[in-house]
């Protein structure tokens, strides 16, 4: 068949292990090809993997996510892409059991976005989809013939299931829309630049440190290994000679038991295998064997060139010469890693071409990424802000995102659940924030009475979850801005109603009437032990959105009867931007996060009548009467906001702020 010659190639995931070797090879060997690489720089990606290509005129790097349809469409059109080599994926099987939705998002949804962009632009002449041998499922131990390309797909874990699902989409777009697709399924790959979550680099780094090599189970599992440069050559052959609509296995019939791999690495380091190999608990999802038929690709002229001994020696030499390539990876070297540690540097030593990224920063994107253009004077840039926000579906969390958009601050919402430490670690590794905002938690719907009958759920979110996030942030040197509550106090003899004497930050909570307040007081006390937390005591939050049912104005304007009692309150339109400024100033400790002074519930409703609805009427009842229609008592108090006022002298009193931010903009003429 005729050889295919591309012009402009988009390689996704090209800062990762295999794709970086492919990109570097094509850039080096084909100077007439323009290579655009797209990578979101996940934990197992590293821009240094592309160092050999960074000065090449036919190379361009773009930081971004394949799940962003706007970005992908923009790249295809503006770069004139005619060929896509799609490597980007979550690939570590172990992680897929703890966070399979992330694998679905990256591996299936991300692939779907690419395919749809190809369909819409109508300019793609080749779409090479990179899959895995694991889609075939486990091979019988006594099988003499490997899985050929027409074999049934029987994935056994969430990772391989998402790769098989992505393949189905690729095949469907090929048949339904005539997209010129080719799929590859590869054996295990090893060599330089690989993140040490995989067996060979993990064992090499452990051996370099003189530590034992942990083997899951009895070590009889069999794998086939190919050296990275041989695999890069295989993709070069598939690119130029592969036939549209076909699948190609990239494999070898040479198999090795995990035991033998460990022994060979011990031999390279002159270590006694008997003393330095330790058998640990097996993984329940550790398939015994993957075996491929490799004849189809060989007919195109490819064959592996690097022997096992030669490849292993090259790999060992590279890791011993580059021990800090990935930074602190001690967490990945554990026998059963709970979650990987933060990898090392992400940037080239010199400046990067951010021209395209800077252009894209002006366009809407799903990742809220703002990439500043490079300075021309060569002075080092102050690290830009990037917030990780928990509580996306909540009122405060949603408002924080809008403020960040307005101020041009990069941010992402956390995907993990607060009580799931591993998912929080993955968020931090993925987002790499400068600050973390926590507005997540349980307040109860429609009100805090819900917490009285859902106590374990309330503890899980408000106590265990908040403490877990604080601890993870502390481990990573991150300031956590924690939105707490001032509903942990009630008027008492030292702070009588109407006295103007408010509760200070150092005062001990005295309100235990509701289970919600108990959990918030408990977690606030425990958070005092964390020096990386800024606790913001919010009370009866109010905003300019008078249609929001969580707005205190909206709440009481819909009540049949209202208790008339003065309280401290928080006007979010004024105070949420202040919380962002507090993060910039790295303020810590406890802060009464309310406007100075108090306002009674009747005064709020009087303003509502005067500004919004002249016909509005309401009735009052006593605390005793209120107690008959609610499950748990409510907190009423005055907070002393002098500490916040001293830090932000422009802070308005509660009544001034209500008029400026809530009632004034909504005034009915």
UniProtKB/Swiss-Prot annotation:
Positions contributing to NADP(+) binding: 391-397
Tissues expressed in: Expressed in roots, stems, leaves, seedlings, inflorescence tips, and siliques. Detected in the adaxial side of cotyledons, in the emerging leaves and in trichomes. Also detected in the root tip, more precisely in the epidermal cells in the meristematic and elongation zone.
Binding site for NAD(+): 13-19
Disruption-associated phenotype: Hyponastic growth, aberrant pavement cell and stomatal morphology in cotyledons, and defective trichome formation.
Record-linked InterPro entries: dTDP_Gluc_deHydtase, NAD(P)-bd_dom, NAD(P)-bd_dom_sf, RmlD-like-bd
GO cellular component annotations of the record: cytosol; mitochondrion; plasmodesma
EC assignment: 4.2.1.76, 1.1.1.-, 5.1.3.-
Pfam short name (any one): GDP_Man_Dehyd
Gene Ontology molecular functions: dTDP-glucose 4,6-dehydratase activity; isomerase activity; oxidoreductase activity; UDP-glucose 4,6-dehydratase activity; UDP-L-rhamnose synthase activity
Domain characteristics, as noted in the entry: The dehydratase activity is contained in the N-terminal region while the epimerase and reductase activities are in the C-terminal region.
Function: Trifunctional enzyme involved in UDP-beta-L-rhamnose biosynthesis, a precursor of the primary cell wall components rhamnogalacturonan I (RG-I) and rhamnogalacturonan II (RG-II). Plays a major role in supplying UDP-rhamnose for flavonol biosynthesis. Catalyzes the dehydration of UDP-glucose to form UDP-4-dehydro-6-deoxy-D-glucose followed by the epimerization of the C3' and C5' positions of UDP-4-dehydro-6-deoxy-D-glucose to form UDP-4-keto-beta-L-rhamnose and the reduction of UDP-4-keto-beta-L-rhamnose to yield UDP-beta-L-rhamnose.
Protein name: Trifunctional UDP-glucose 4,6-dehydratase/UDP-4-keto-6-deoxy-D-glucose 3,5-epimerase/UDP-4-keto-L-rhamnose-reductase RHM1
Species lineage: Eukaryota, Viridiplantae, Streptophyta, Embryophyta, Tracheophyta
Gene field: RHM1
């Amino acid at each position: 068949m005729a050889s295919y010659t591309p012009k402009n190639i988009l390689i996704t995931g090209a800062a990762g292990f295999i794709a970086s070797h492919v990109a570097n090879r094509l850039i080096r060997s084909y100077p007439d090809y323009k290579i655009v690489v797209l990578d979101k720089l996940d934990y197992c990606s590293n821009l240094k993997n592309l160092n050999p290509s960074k000065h090449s005129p036919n190379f361009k790097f773009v930081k971004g996510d394949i799940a962003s349809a706007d970005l992908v469409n923009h790249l295809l059109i503006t770069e004139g892409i005619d060929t896509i080599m799609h490597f980007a994926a979550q690939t570590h099987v172990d992680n897929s059991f703890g966070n399979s939705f992330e694998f679905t998002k990256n591996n299936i949804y991300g692939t779907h976005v690419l395919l749809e962009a190809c369909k819409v632009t109508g300019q793609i002449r080749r779409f090479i989809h990179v899959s895995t041998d694991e889609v075939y499922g486990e091979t019988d131990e006594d099988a003499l013939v490997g899985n050929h390309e027409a074999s049934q797909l029987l994935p056994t874990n969430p990772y391989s299931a998402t790769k098989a699902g992505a393949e189905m989409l690729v095949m469907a777009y090929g048949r339904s829309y005539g997209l010129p697709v080719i799929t590859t399924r590869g054996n295990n790959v090893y060599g330089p630049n690989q993140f040490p979550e995989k067996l060979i680099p993990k064992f090499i780094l452990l051996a370099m440190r003189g530590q034992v090599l942990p083997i899951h189970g009895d070590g009889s599992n069999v794998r086939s290994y190919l050296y990275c440069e041989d695999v890069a050559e295989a993709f070069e052959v598939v690119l130029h000679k592969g036939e549209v609509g076909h699948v190609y296995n990239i494999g070898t019939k040479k198999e090795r038991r995990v035991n033998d791999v460990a022994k060979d690495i011990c031999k390279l380091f002159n270590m006694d295998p008997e003393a330095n190999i330790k058998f640990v608990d097996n993984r329940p999802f550790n398939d015994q064997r993957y075996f491929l038929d490799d004849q189809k690709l060989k007919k195109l002229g490819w064959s592996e060139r690097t022997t096992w001994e030669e490849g292993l020696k090259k790999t060992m030499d590279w890791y011993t010469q580059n021990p800090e390539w990935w930074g602190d990876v001690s967490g990945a070297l554990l026998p059963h890693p709970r979650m990987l540690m933060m990898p090392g540097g992400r940037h080239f030593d010199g400046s990067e071409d951010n021209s395209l990224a800077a252009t894209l920063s002006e366009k809407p994107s799903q990742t809220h990424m703002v990439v500043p253009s490079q300075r021309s004077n060569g002075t080092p840039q102050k690290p830009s802000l990037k917030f990780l926000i928990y509580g996306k579906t909540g009122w405060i969390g949603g408002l924080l995102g809008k403020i960040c958009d307005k101020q041009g601050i990069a941010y992402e919402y956390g995907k993990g659940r607060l009580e799931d430490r591993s998912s929080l670690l993955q968020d931090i590794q993925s987002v790499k924030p400068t600050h973390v905002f926590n507005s997540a938690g349980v307040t109860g719907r429609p009100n805090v009475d819900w917490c009285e009958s859902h106590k374990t759920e309330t503890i899980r979110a408000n106590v265990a979850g908040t403490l877990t996030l604080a601890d993870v942030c502390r481990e990573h040197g991150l300031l956590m801005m924690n939105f707490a509550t001032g509903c942990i106090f009630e008027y008492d003899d030292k702070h009588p109603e109407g006295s103007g004497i408010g509760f200070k930050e150092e005062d001990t909570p005295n309100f235990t009437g509701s289970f919600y307040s108990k959990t918030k007081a408990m977690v606030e006390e425990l958070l005092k032990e964390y020096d990386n937390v800024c606790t913001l005591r919010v009370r009866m939050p109010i905003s300019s959105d008078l249609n929001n049912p969580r707005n205190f104005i909206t709440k009481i304007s819909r009540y049949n009867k209202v208790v008339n009692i003065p309280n401290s309150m928080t006007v979010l339109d004024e105070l949420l931007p202040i919380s962002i400024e507090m993060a910039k100033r790295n303020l810590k400790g406890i802060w009464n996060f309310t406007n100075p002074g108090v306002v009674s519930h009747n005064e709020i409703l009087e303003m509502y009548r005067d500004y919004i609805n002249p016909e509005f009427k309401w009735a009052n009842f006593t605390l005793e009467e209120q107690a008959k229609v609610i499950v748990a008592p409510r907190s009423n108090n005055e907070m002393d906001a002098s500490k916040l006022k001293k830090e932000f002298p422009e802070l308005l009193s509660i009544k001034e702020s209500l008029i400026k931010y809530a009632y004034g903009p909504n005034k009915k003429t």
